[in-house]
Regions:
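Outer-membrane beta-barrel architecture
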Residues: 14, 65-67, 104-108, 165-167, ...
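Outer-membrane beta-barrel "beta-signal"
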Residues: 367-379
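Transmembrane beta-barrel strands of outer-membrane/channel proteins
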Residues: 32-38, 80-84, 116-118, 178-182, ...
Length: 379
């Protein structure tokens, strides 16, 4: 057994023993979601595929979470959270180089909470501090391509290492959140501060009984790991989000504008399939991005009908040598239907279609039909 696998096994055993011992001294909860089904894609430039759903191919990824809290004094508390995302079709960890995809120590009170560790950015549907969830930006509650807003807005490829975050609390009223990450563990060891990928976000808004609105300001300093490549300009992204509960229909609108984006969403296909590695590496400027996403949900009894419509326009500002197209757009739409078998178990049926042109004509996620069906169980 390799040292890395042995260390993971020892760590897992230690955590199990620690959790059992800690249960008597603090409140420890184990929760998660198991989602599986079938997934079909028919890309415009490739063969269609029908298979058992894997990672990122169900509305929510299968995950296991363990959270413990202990009261300190007055209304102050301290706690921890660790979680692993699982590819259920293979039984493997989605982030195979991490025992836990997310891990944090937190301390707070009734008004504010601070966290330290490996934490998700605000502009996705991953807890603990998802502004998308707080403002109901994605009412489909699904991360499918052609549906989720995070596919075309600022989104970190993975949860952020070395992160510090805070968030005010409360279900109603104004809120404020902040996050800072100074790069991955490997970059921290091997590169100086000026060479590492660094991310910061600040978000604020209002959550009312019917109306919710707010903004996310994102800043990212791209890494510079090749000495002879030009230094890339920093990314600045702005989200404007609003949602309203019309009763029973709920609707949300998200607008995103980005300057010097170095990816669309979390995928690496800007470099791999759109502008090419040479132009990407030799560019100081990135994408200018504009996207609008509208989502809606209509719950009625055991049924929930949801839909999403997206339009995005992107212009490459960097090295254009050899490029046939330097700008492009995508329009996509989709729907997800849920049927509640019980309080914990739901069936889902989803479909989406995306059509990208010019710069966005090659990536399959912008040019395909997608269909999915399956079951999710929460515990």
């Amino acid at each position: 057994m390799s040292l890395s696998r042995l260390s993971l096994a020892v760590a897992a055993a230690a955590i199990s023993l620690t959790a059992a011992a800690a249960a008597s001294a603090a409140e420890v909860q184990i929760s998660g979601i198991i989602a599986e089904g079938f997934y079909y894609t028919n890309p415009a430039h490739g063969d269609d595929a029908f298979k058992m759903a894997g990672y990122k191919e169900t509305p929510w990824d299968s995950a296991l979470n363990m959270k413990g809290t202990e009261k300190l004094w007055d209304d102050w508390y301290v706690g921890f959270h660790v979680g692993s995302t699982i590819a259920l079709d293979t039984g493997s960890l989605a982030n195979q180089d991490h025992l836990f995809g997310s891990s944090r120590l937190f301390i707070g009170n009734n008004d504010i909470e601070f966290s330290f560790g490996r934490i998700a950015n605000f502009s996705c549907a991953t807890q603990p501090y998802s502004v998308y969830m707080r403002l109901r930006a994605n009412l489909t509650n699904a991360s499918f391509t052609g549906i989720a807003p995070a596919n075309v807005t600022f989104n970190a490829p993975e949860n952020l290492d070395n992160a510090i975050a805070f968030s005010t609390k409360g279900e109603r009223g104004f809120f404020l959140q902040g996050l800072y990450s100074n790069g991955t563990e490997t970059q921290e060891k091997n590169y100086g501060w000026s060479d590492r990928n660094i991310v910061a976000q600040l978000a604020g808004g209002w959550t009312g009984e019917k109306l919710r609105f707010g903004t996310i300001l994102s800043w990212e300093k791209p890494d510079r790991l090749t000495a002879d490549a030009p230094e890339k300009h920093d990314t600045f992204g702005t989200h404007l989000i609003a949602s309203y509960n019309f009763g029973p229909v709920v609707s949300a609108v998200t607008y995103y504008h980005g300057e010097n984006d170095w990816r669309i969403g979390a995928a690496p296909d800007l470099k791999n399939q759109m502008v090419g590695g040479e132009a990407y590496n030799q560019s100081a400027k990135g994408l200018r991005s504009n996207a609008v996403v509208i989502t809606a949900a209509y719950p009625v009894g055991r049924h929930t009908f949801t839909g999403a419509l997206t339009y995005g326009k992107f212009e490459w500002q960097g090295n254009k040598e050899g490029l046939e197209e330097s700008e492009g757009s995508v329009i996509s739409g989709g729907s997800v239907y849920y049927y509640a078998l019980s309080k914990r178990t739901r069936l889902y049926l989803a479909a989406s279609y995306a059509d990208g042109d010019k710069l966005l004509a090659k990536p399959a996620r912008f040019n395909q039909f997608m269909g999915a069906a399956g079951m999710m169980y929460n515990f």
